[in-house]
Amino acid sequence: FYISSTGIPLPQLRNKPELKTIEAYWNRSSSTFFEPAGASGTYKFSGCNKLENLYLYGANITGEWPVFTNPQLKIIDLRYTSITGGGGKTDALPGGYSASTYAIPPNILEDCSELQNFWFISSSVASGSGLGYELFESCSSLRYFNIYCYGKLSGGIPNLSGLGNLQYAYAYWNGLTGTLPSFAGSNSIYGVQLQGNKFTGSIPSYTNLTNLRFLYVHNNELDGTMGEFINCNNLYYFYAHNNRLVGALPDFSGAPNLRYIILFNNNLTGYIGGALSGVLRMNYLDLSNNDFVQSALNQLIDDLYTNYQTSPRGGVTINLKNIRNNGVLVIPSEEQLDKVDQLRNAGWNVKLD
């Protein structure tokens, strides 16, 4: 069923047993998921047991969420819609919670075990509303979710345990709180974008995520330590700048193919010897505006020099500007400054105060 860019409101299509696809891109006539409109109405696509694809990108869908009673649904695309949140099943909600508490209620996907892609972008949700913790618990086939609500959310990210097929986890610039997920058991994960939230605590260790290519957790409120990367051989991009991370820079030997390590504007003080010596494809390292003590800074420079000796190359940028401990600018020792000069002569752009 195709009505993209026609201006036709989303019709009632209940009990269409062979219907597989509904496509209504950029339909600007206001519609809801219910007929008649409102919470007392009936879900327009109930009884469509073979419905697989719901493409409503840019459609002016307003109002509350339905429970998607379509067991074959694979794709729900609700990017740039005007859904306000709430709805779903109102029974069995946690004590003290109502449907209006949620930008996306916890139970709307409980019949969607085949769901692969869930995309939702809306600026119309209520400020301070949250994501249901159980949202994806029935979605064992989920590969890709993208949720963006323009900084209006609060509360934590949904439970992601048991999502062994998950490849992309995007929930950026939302205002989410709590701690970062470890993606344990999600060994297919490729891309993580959780930047621009209010996550606190530590960055967990990431283990056996052999497909992980990029991990973006910058611009949060992370104030703990950093875990290790263990058997993350395909990680290229790690961004965790603009947080309040403390402790030591972790050992990156378990992510030897890292290209970009961006950690400026944190409170890191220590360095684990060997952490960077084996990251031989590194192109860009930014540790500016941290709190390393001189011994840590010296060891770091020693390892960068070892890195170059192991894999001679130019074009690498290293930013170590404004390293201060207790407010005092930290300068490397003479031996390490000599190594910096050698790296610069080899074509490395090493920035120091």
List each language-model region with its residue ranges.
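The leucine-rich repeat
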Residues: 8-10, 33-43, 64-66, 86-88, ...
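Extracellular/surface-exposed low-complexity segments
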Residues: 330-353
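Conserved hydrophobic beta-strand positions in leucine-rich repeat
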Residues: 1, 22-24, 54-56, 74-78, ...
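LRR N-terminal entry segment and analogous cap-like coil->beta motifs
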Residues: 1-10, 15-33, 97-98, 112, ...
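Leucine-rich repeat
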Residues: 15-18, 47-50, 69-72, 111-114, ...
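Consensus "Asn ladder" position of solenoid repeat domains
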Residues: 6, 27, 59, 81, ...
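Leucine-rich repeat domain C-terminal region
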Residues: 265, 277-333
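Conserved hydrophobic position(s) of the canonical leucine-rich repeat
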Residues: 7, 19, 30, 51, ...
